Amino acid sequence: MAQSRLFFSADKAEAERTYNILEQAFEDDGFPIAITEIDEDRQIFEVSVYVEDDAEEVAARVDALVGPGLFDTEELPDIDWVTHSLEGLKPVRAGHFFVHGSHDRDKIEPGDIAIEIDAGLAFGTGHHGTTAGCLELIEETVQTEHPTNALDLGTGSAVLAIAIARLAPIPILATDIDPIAVTVAAENAAKNGVAEHIVTATAEGFGHPIFRSYSPFDLIVANILANPLIELAPSIKEHLAPGGSIILSGILDSQHDAVLAAYQTQGLTHQKTLHREGWVAIHLK
């Protein structure tokens, strides 16, 4: 199958801005999108989009989003670029969490809460600003509020569910609409030694009967996108235990106020917002 890479290099701020635009635009297409540092001295980063067969069509969409002629295109050998696209990313620290691939186990330091997530078919490796913000809020919330159960809605790679389990041995339900993500989530939970605490399920919204067995939740985390978060606000509030906390992300800076208003309308109180690389993570109670 023909594979191509669309790529563009710029300074850190411009590369991150472009990466965020493309990731938001191509969320439903499933194209792997990566940002990697290619010149540490000059702080130059490269944004790559990996596509199969339809490179010209995707290139036209990219031009419409970020301006014509910025991205170059190259043909690639037939290898697993879904995995390869993120191999160059460095480990990420978020609070005491250290999210890393298997090739960076030697970089774990004393005191780290290590989470091993290799790049693959499920979104959410911890290398993304929106995930990092969630991890920081999870650490603070779990350690201060001591929830007795939790929900990771739209779990992706299960990095957030794993983070909760590493802090507290409580029942955690991790759901996603994508069955591939659910399979990957279960594998990652096992790899990180917390499978006994995490139950995974393929579910869209809250329609799955499994929620009747676990709800209400002391802690709900949802790192998805702004529009689904707004639509799900009543259901998320309905499944939150009295006094419980919600941590939301997948939200651009410009979308913060609209998402916050949707949850304040449900009677929730804003606790804190973290800003990371153009994205926000919101804590409400």
Swiss-Prot record:
InterPro entries: Ribosomal_L11_MeTrfase_PrmA (IPR050078), Ribosomal_PrmA_MeTrfase (IPR004498), SAM-dependent_MTases_sf (IPR029063)
EC number: 2.1.1.-
Domain of life: Bacteria
TM helices/strands, residue ranges: none
Reaction equations catalysed: L-lysyl-[protein] + 3 S-adenosyl-L-methionine = N(6),N(6),N(6)-trimethyl-L-lysyl-[protein] + 3 S-adenosyl-L-homocysteine + 3 H(+)
Protein name per the record: Ribosomal protein L11 methyltransferase
Family the UniProt entry places it in: Belongs to the methyltransferase superfamily. PrmA family.
Keyword terms, alphabetized: Cytoplasm, Methyltransferase, S-adenosyl-L-methionine, Transferase
Function: Methylates ribosomal protein L11.
Gene3D superfamilies: Vaccinia Virus protein VP39
Gene Ontology molecular function, alphabetical: protein-lysine N-methyltransferase activity
Pfam families: PrmA (PF06325)
Any one of the GO CC terms: cytoplasm
Enzyme's top EC category: transferase
CDD domains the UniProt entry points to: AdoMet_MTases
One GO term (biological process): methylation
Subcellular location: Cytoplasm
Lineage of source species: Bacteria, Pseudomonadati, Pseudomonadota, Alphaproteobacteria, Hyphomicrobiales
Bridged cysteine pairs (disulfide): none
Binding site residues for S-adenosyl-L-methionine: 131, 154, 176, 223
